[in-house]
């Protein structure tokens, strides 16, 4: 059974393997053992209540409960930008007009922004290519909503998610090549690595402070503003089905879109509910895939099961109960996947 659980120190080797498969552009999952070890330690200190809000971040892994193999990672930052500034570009408009000359130009413009400061962030979503089947992607992404619903007071009103922008297999980013490289004088992969390993001071020091007309960028760069990496398109679709929207904010490095949603309007959070569990054999039937999660903060587990989403008493097998770290009589959180998400 595939389950979501909190990260552990022993996961470092598995995370290094996952980081080596990202193909670049996933800033928060660098192939750097010291950085990943520090990320794990920060997550564990978050669970133990040792960190201030601005440093808190949860990390989860997707595990095969029978073999112990890890095939994915996802994370939540509790509040971005409270320690280091959290930058993006807002895609807006500047109008230049002259009645005398009968000229009117509305020009798309990039404005440096810290507008999402304090928001909770969904981040570090990566699923091993060999695991991209049987609904694992839905489980990996949406399990975070089950955790947020259970422990709502630990998160802020707005949730954001930066989507990976367009980058080729060689690490070439049209947006970076046309804009960022002119100010940072380094390749995208180098800037991405520095940011991913926590060396972010250079961003504030070198970022252009004035608005930038997108017409000054190459046509190739203009075309990828707000667009996602092909491998990220499914993740974007999953979030959009949950209520997330692109509000014209983009990543300063690759131009990928930032999606956002008020936390209480996220579908899985809004519609999830608590039901009692019982041990037994689930009744036969063509039931939809549902997310099921326990309410145990320190030993959180989430999985996909086929069940009646309207039930008030969820019957699970002994193996399922064990994987979810719960027992008969406990209450678990239940919500079905979106109706069109049937590939489980």
From Swiss-Prot:
Catalytic activity: succinyl-CoA + L-arginine = N(2)-succinyl-L-arginine + CoA + H(+)
EC assignment: 2.3.1.109
Keyword vocabulary terms for this entry: Acyltransferase, Arginine metabolism, Transferase
InterPro entries registered for this protein in UniProt: Acyl_CoA_acyltransferase, Arg_succinylTrfase_AstA/AruG, Arginine_N-succinylTrfase
Highest taxon in the source lineage: Bacteria
Pathway: Amino-acid degradation; L-arginine degradation via AST pathway; L-glutamate and succinate from L-arginine: step 1/5
Binding residue positions for succinyl-CoA: 125
MF (Gene Ontology): arginine N-succinyltransferase activity; N-succinylarginine dihydrolase activity
Active-site annotation: 229
Classification via HAMAP family: AstA
Family from the record: Belongs to the arginine N-succinyltransferase family.
Function noted in UniProt: Catalyzes the transfer of succinyl-CoA to arginine to produce N(2)-succinylarginine.
Stated name of the protein: Arginine N-succinyltransferase
């Amino acid at each position: 059974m595939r389950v979501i659980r909190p990260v552990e120190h022993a996961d470092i080797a598995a995370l290094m393997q996952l980081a080596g498969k990202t193909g670049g552009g996933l800033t928060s999952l660098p192939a750097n053992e010291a950085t990943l070890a520090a990320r794990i330690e920060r997550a564990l200190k978050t669970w133990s209540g040792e960190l201030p809000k601005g440093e808190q971040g949860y990390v989860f892994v997707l595990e095969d409960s029978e073999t112990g193999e890890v095939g994915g990672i996802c994370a939540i930052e509790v509040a971005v930008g409270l320690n280091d500034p959290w930058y993006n570009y807002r895609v807006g408009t500047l109008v230049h007009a002259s009645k005398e000359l009968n000229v009117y130009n509305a020009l798309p413009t990039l404005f440096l922004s810290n507008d999402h400061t304090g928001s909770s962030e969904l981040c570090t979503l990566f699923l091993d290519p060999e695991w991209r089947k049987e609904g694992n992607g839905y489980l990996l992404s949406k399990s975070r909503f089950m955790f947020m619903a259970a422990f709502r007071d630990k998160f802020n009103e707005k949730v954001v998610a930066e989507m990976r922008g367009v980058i080729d297999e060689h690490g070439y980013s049209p947006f970076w090549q046309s804009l960022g490289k002119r100010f940072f004088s380094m390749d995208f992969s180098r800037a991405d690595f520095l940011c991913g390993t926590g060396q972010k001071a250079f961003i504030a020091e070198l970022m252009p402070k004035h608005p930038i007309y997108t017409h000054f960028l190459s046509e190739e760069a203009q075309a990828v503003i707000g667009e996602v990496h092909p491998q990220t398109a499914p993740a974007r679709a999953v979030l959009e089905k949950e209520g997330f929207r692109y509000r014209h904010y983009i990543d300063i490095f690759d131009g990928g879109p930032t999606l956002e949603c008020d936390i209480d309007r996220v579908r899985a959070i809004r519609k999830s509910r608590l039901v009692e569990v019982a041990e037994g054999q689930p009744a036969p039937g063509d039931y939809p895939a549902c997310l099921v999660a326990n309410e145990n903060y320190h030993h959180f587990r989430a999985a996909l099961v086929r069940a009646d989403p309207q039930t008030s008493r969820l019957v699970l097998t002994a193996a399922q109960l064990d994987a979810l770290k719960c027992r008969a009589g406990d209450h678990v959180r239940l919500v079905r996947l979106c109706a069109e998400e049937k590939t489980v």
